[in-house]
């Protein structure tokens, strides 16, 4: 689902990504851990076209997003980005819209679904996430864990092939992380590939098929290991 080769990204004279190689396969949950400033979030943002890289390549679901300083055309980028879901660290839900309205916004505007089609799909997603009774609530009426699940639901509504999570438990009480972990593991059983950035090693061990350590703009291959059990 994701293939990155020799990826470089700089901010001015500061080199943040220094030749990153990374693969994520269908149904895999890959977690990237490492200290702040090591390049994890920049890598995630680069995959989602929120940052532009200078060299290397990014291929998503067999489609070339970026190669050797050149990005796909605007039309191609739009198609590729439909395969990527992103759940932000701060949820980024629209505060003036209900949970249901948050979820149907992108499918109607971007995918061209009718409101009826988008609503039917959204209600299925809310059922899967255990949020059916919160469909008409506004974000301020939700707990942190419920907001995170609603944010996941909004990303799922676009039917992505690769889901990216930026620190999905950082704003949650530790007692709520199991809820998010269970949702993520359920998604992987449906074949969705996931890339997760986190500082929470306990959470990483609960969800990951593979954990990669990243620091100083590079993947530390000697720290890659397979998780034998998801406790």
Regions found by a protein language model. Give the residues of each.
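H-loop/switch region of ABC-family ATPase nucleotide-binding domains
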Residues: 198-199
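Helix-to-loop junction immediately C-terminal to a conserved catalytic motif
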Residues: 48
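Conserved ABC ATPase signature
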Residues: 138-142, 146
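Helix N-cap at the start of a conserved alpha-helix in ABC-type nucleotide-binding domains
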Residues: 174-176
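A short, proline-enriched helix->beta-strand linker immediately N-terminal to the Walker B motif
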Residues: 157-161
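ABC ATPase NBD coupling module
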Residues: 65-85, 115
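Conserved ABC ATPase "signature" region
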Residues: 63-66, 115-133
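Catalytic Walker B motif of ABC-type/P-loop ATPase nucleotide-binding domains
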Residues: 163-166
């Amino acid at each position: 689902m994701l293939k990155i080769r020799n990826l470089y990204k700089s901010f001015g004279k500061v080199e943040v990504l220094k030749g990153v190689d990374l693969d994520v396969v269908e149904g895999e949950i890959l977690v990237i851990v490492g200290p702040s400033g090591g390049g994890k979030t920049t890598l995630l943002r680069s995959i989602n076209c929120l940052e532009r890289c200078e060299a290397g390549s990014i291929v998503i679901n067999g489609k070339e997003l970026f190669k050797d300083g050149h990005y796909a055309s605007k039309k191609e980028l739009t198609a590729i980005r439909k395969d990527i879901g992103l759940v932000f660290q701060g949820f980024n839900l629209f505060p003036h819209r209900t949970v249901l309205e948050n979820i149907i916004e992108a499918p109607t505007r971007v995918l061209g679904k009718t409101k009826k089609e988008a609503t039917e799909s959204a209600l299925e997603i809310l059922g899967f996430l255990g949020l059916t009774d919160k469909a008409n609530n506004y974000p301020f009426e939700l707990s942190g864990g419920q907001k995170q699940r609603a944010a996941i639901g909004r990303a799922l509504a676009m039917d992505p092939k690769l889901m990216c999570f930026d620190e999905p438990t950082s704003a949650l009480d530790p007692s709520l992380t199991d809820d998010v972990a269970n949702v993520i593991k359920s998604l992987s059983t449906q074949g969705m590939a996931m890339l997760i950035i986190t500082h929470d090693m306990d959470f990483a061990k609960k969800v990951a098929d593979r954990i990669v350590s990243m620091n100083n703009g590079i993947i530390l291959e000697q720290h890659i290991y397979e998780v034998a059990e998801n406790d």
